[in-house]
Amino acid sequence: MFTDWKYPEKLKRVNEVLDRVNLKDANKKFPSELSGGMKKRVGIARAIVLNPKFLFCDEPNSGLDPQTSLLIDKLIKEITIEYNITTIVNTHDMNSVMEIGDHIIYMYEGKKQWEGNNKEIIFSKNDRLNEFIFASEFLKDAKDMRMLEHTGKISNDRDMDELLNK
């Protein structure tokens, strides 16, 4: 499709998608002049230039700081909606999962272990998923506080008084 376009049409479309990812003047720079986050946004622009039906993102936030990661997550979510495309994200970043994921599948050793949405994941009883999500004590406490808020009890044999008095 794109190969049949005349140069001015191609340039116009490239500039449109660069503008959409907030990189209006990136086409005037060398790749070495772009930050990691800018390179990720260029990658997203390249992926959407032909109006695809699917967007595949493999670890879209690898190597990025937390603020830039959040920006990339929001951009992926916005583009998914604006372009009415199905986006598939492969990631180990639970922040991205929670930010982007409408429908989440957790896999372990190539097998589906859990399926649901980003609201249900907090209440999952799948031990392997919980080990992955709530690896730190802080996150375990956050989950227990969430469970306490919604159900009046915590999810395991942890001491509720200790949790509340931390």
Language model segments and positions:
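Catalytic Walker B motif of ABC-type/P-loop ATPase nucleotide-binding domains
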Residues: 55-58
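Conserved ABC ATPase "signature" region
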Residues: 7-25
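Helix N-cap at the start of a conserved alpha-helix in ABC-type nucleotide-binding domains
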Residues: 66-68
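C-terminal boundary and immediately downstream tail of ABC-type ATPase nucleotide-binding domains
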Residues: 122-157
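Conserved ABC ATPase signature
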Residues: 30-34, 38
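A short, proline-enriched helix->beta-strand linker immediately N-terminal to the Walker B motif
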Residues: 49-53
